[in-house]
Amino acid sequence: MPPKSPNRSGKSTPTRGRPGEKKDEEKLLQDEEEERLRLEQEEKARQEKEAREKLEQERRAELDTKKDKQVFETNIELGAVKLEVEQVKNDKLAHAEWNRYMKCDGKPDPTSVKEINTFISLSHEKGSPDVNIVLEDAKLILSLISDLNELLEDFTPEEFEQKVDSYRQTILSLQDLLLNRYNEATLKMLKEASYEADSESGNLQKVVDGENETIMLWANLNKNPRFKLFEFENEKISFELPKVLAMADIAVRILRTKFDHYSHQCTTFLPKKKKVKDEEPIPEEPPKPEDAEEVEVKGDEENGEDAKSVVEEGRQSKQSNEPGLVNEGEKEEETKKDENEGEKEDAVKTPDVQIEIEDDEEEILDPDVVDLRQFSPLGGVYHVDLLKTPPQPNIVRGWTLTQIIDKPLSTVKYPSDNPNTGRSSSRVASANPEGRDEGSPSKTPLEQQQPPIGLTFALPSNVMFFEEPQVASWDSSDKHWKTSGITDTNFDEENRKLLFKTQEFGTFCLMQDSHLNMPFQSWELKPKGTNSTVLTITAAIAEVEIEVKDSKCRLNAPAEDPPKELSGLYGKWMAVPKLIAAMRDAGVNVFPAEDSHKFVSIQSKEVDLERVYEQMAILSSTFAFSWSKWNNDAGSKQVIIQIAPCLIKENVPRDAVSDDDWSIFSVSDDMSYKLALSEYDEEFADVVAKGATYHCDLLHAQYERQPLKTATKNCWNNSPKNHKTRTSFSFTRLPHY
């Protein structure tokens, strides 16, 4: 029989596990172990994250508390400075008023409309035309104008809004009075021209020098047909007259003034005020279309009246010799105030967007109009006038016969359709009926008969011109400096002379780009002791060094080849506004205006720089500051500067700060910290330096530096015991100017 099968009985017998099943079990166990480890790691990571978040929250809370404390301390210090500035302003005004009262010299109070009107009236009625007396009166008038300008500069319009228009109108009235006094002196000299005629030429050639002006007068008494050109030798100013004027009863007056009474009348003299858009939603019930049109038209009419009144005030002041212009201006101002108060609600409802659009349209100037935000008039103003010579005294049989003419100084219009040239223009035209010159077919008959006038101005010896100056003439109707009508300009750089031709007589000035020395190449601010520091600026062309001590400052001369044009400024201590004005008048403008970024290519920074400057001023007695090349690589919300400690005493050498002392700091509106960066690195890295911490401002970032805590704290601590070492208010208030 065959053998039985093992499973034939039907009972199951144990079998060995398959290899695949064993692997599955091992994998399952491994997955379970990995899952357990993963959960443990996640739990550990969660706990660590919670711990970090808790620490971060605690750190942030600590930083917030620290920041609040630091901001509070800084605000106290800066607030004290601002209060001191306001007190200084008030004391200055009271001191000036008291000095005027104590002098008792008969000088009128420029802030009193009544006294100014009385002064103007008496000047018209009793003022002597003698040139020496006129020059003395000019000093008084200019001092009154200067006092009013200082008031307008020291105080913002918001501080005495009701007086601004009155002060400006007073300035215009005084300027018109001054020009009228010059005309009276000129007329008197012309009436006596034959007594002072030159023995060789037979013409009047007279120059009168004043403290602020020079009157150059030439009268055509001889009427030499060969006359062509005359030069005032000492002043190096000459004019070339066309032949059509050689036989005329005319005189030429060139009045050169060191002051400029025209530019402030331009619409581009001051920067445009930024209009703040009203974020309030439009009312639910907007005005009807008819009402909206009425409001818009009404606003336009008011704006038109305001603009027209400024021009008309200047015209009326020149046409009338009677006082009272200031009162009329005040009446107009009161009338406008009443109208504005009555329409206040309508004005609020008028959209601000429309006003901004109107401002943008005003900024679009004609090509020949000089933008005073971009260019600056330098060297004063040249008034070149063609005058009519009054009848001269005649001597008959020992008697001197003088024709009495009670008329003001009269000007001769040139070019004119019918010029008074000794022969009628019709005769000249009849010689060439077609009005055509074969040699110059492009010229008109008027240009052939009355060619342009040639003028040569010597550049002022106290003004630096870094490029060829631009000539501009004053347009009295538009109240702008313009370049139209100026031709054939030729600049003699070696002899510092500018030659040009003009079709009309008038008022001229020399212009230069205000931003020639911008942007700066570098700058440094180094202390020389308590309340004393030196600012060195390497500009695009010039290099200047300004020393500041207490509330005064001065321009230091360079060691080698100091410019002769600035010799009158070197070493003279002045108040900050006066030094800024003096340097600008001398052609060295290193003081950016609030809108200079429109004309200079720079990286704009969205940082409150004024607040940074204030803190730098507080620290400037013990810290040196400098520019950093990384400032351009940083973002718009960061300012990168170099700072070095200077625990020095008085009169320390300039090179007391070594390269190793400088550290680089990042400053923003809400944070300041030291960077792990040097000026010699190849790439910019915004990384906090080892051991440094974040601070709310520059002031506290310097306070943490060892071993300077005590010295830095004394720079700005208000404690009386630190009075000798802290920076004074008179020094820290300088940035406010």
Swiss-Prot record:
InterPro entries named among the record's database cross-references: CASC1_C, IC97/Casc1_N, IC97/Dnai7-like
Pfam families linked to this entry: Casc1_C, Casc1_N
Start-end of Polar residues biased regions: 1-15, 417-429, 441-451
Compositional bias per record (Basic and acidic residues), positions renumbered to this chain: 18-61, 276-316, 333-349
GO molecular function: beta-tubulin binding; microtubule binding
Family: Belongs to the DNAI7 family.
Name the record gives this protein: Dynein axonemal intermediate chain 7 homolog
Organism: Ciona intestinalis (Transparent sea squirt)
